[in-house]
Amino acid sequence: MHKIQKMSCTPSVRSRYTLKRKRLNSAKSATLKKKKVFLSNSEFFAGVSTNYELGKDFLREMDTPICTSNTVFLPVKFSDVAPGRCLTLSPYGHSSVLGFHCQECKPDSSSGFTQAQQSAESNELLSVNLCFLNNVEKVVQHKAFYLSLLGHSMNTVKQSLGQPSLLYCYTVLKKFYPQIFPIFTANGPMLTMYIIFTSLTLHVSEAVLRILTDNVENHNLSADCYKGHYILSIEPQALEESNLNVCVTKICDLVAQLDFSDELKQEYVNGSTLIANFLN
């Protein structure tokens, strides 16, 4: 009888012991949680820099970048975008994204600029002077560029020949955005070029940013939004020192023969009105 009673009590004793052990473990866990120390960025990087092995272990555990996308505010200068990043502008927000993490910037995308493309273009897009000399007489191919200048006057066409960076930027942008139409404004002896996009979103690839910022000097290149239109601005900060020899008379004669169709005239008028309001 005594033996039966002892056996019946055993499960109860074990249950109380198990419950007590769980409570102790729970208390220890709570204590550990309370003892968590949060480090500031400077403290974390200071620790990693002094303990090389810890830094390597931390990097091994990373499978994605710490930050793939940063919010940007318009207007944004191209020079302020960190190398290796692109720009994505939309009604829902604007951001700069790591190029290799962007679907649009991958080599198989039309926005990408691969080594093969560089070779095919004979590196023309990587040199302002070379690109200008190769394209300045291709008046029909760059019809929109020259007709927009002619909308001011033939003297404005001549004036543009002293600013090779304008035709260079237009040629680069046209490779990525074939349907662009530039608008020009004059500020004394210098011309500023604006490219207007009417799409809801605009992606400026890492390749475009890299090519323009690496090769165009003394210009403020920026993106802004006005009345639902995205506007890229190419504004000179100083007169260009250009010693390139071009046949001005020949180019002006070719421009004078261009057909300024009603459709292009309307696009020119609409664009000029938008830019005038944008600048006021």
UniProtKB/Swiss-Prot annotation:
Keywords, sorted A to Z: Host membrane, Host nucleus, Membrane, Metal-binding, Phosphoprotein, Zinc, Zinc-finger
Primary localization: host cell
One MF annotation (Gene Ontology) recorded for this entry: zinc ion binding
Post-translational modification: Phosphorylated at serine residues in the N-terminus. This phosphorylation regulates the localization within the inner nuclear membrane.
Compartments where found: Host nucleus inner membrane
Pfam family for this entry, one: Herpes_UL31
Zinc fingers, CCCH-type class: 86-203
UniProt cross-references to InterPro entries, sorted A to Z: Herpes_UL31
GO biological process, one term: viral budding from nuclear membrane
Subunit and interaction comment: Forms a heterohexameric complex with NEC2. Interacts with capsid vertex specific component 2/CVC2; this interaction directs the capsid to the host inner nuclear membrane to initiate budding.
Function noted in UniProt: Plays an essential role in virion nuclear egress, the first step of virion release from infected cell. Within the host nucleus, NEC1 interacts with the newly formed capsid through the vertexes and directs it to the inner nuclear membrane by associating with NEC2. Induces the budding of the capsid at the inner nuclear membrane as well as its envelopment into the perinuclear space.
Protein family according to the UniProt entry: Belongs to the herpesviridae NEC1 protein family.
HAMAP family registered for this protein in UniProt: HSV_NEC1 (MF_04023)
Name listed for the protein in its UniProt record: Nuclear egress protein 1
Organism: Alcelaphine herpesvirus 1 (strain C500) (AlHV-1)
Gene for this chain: NEC1
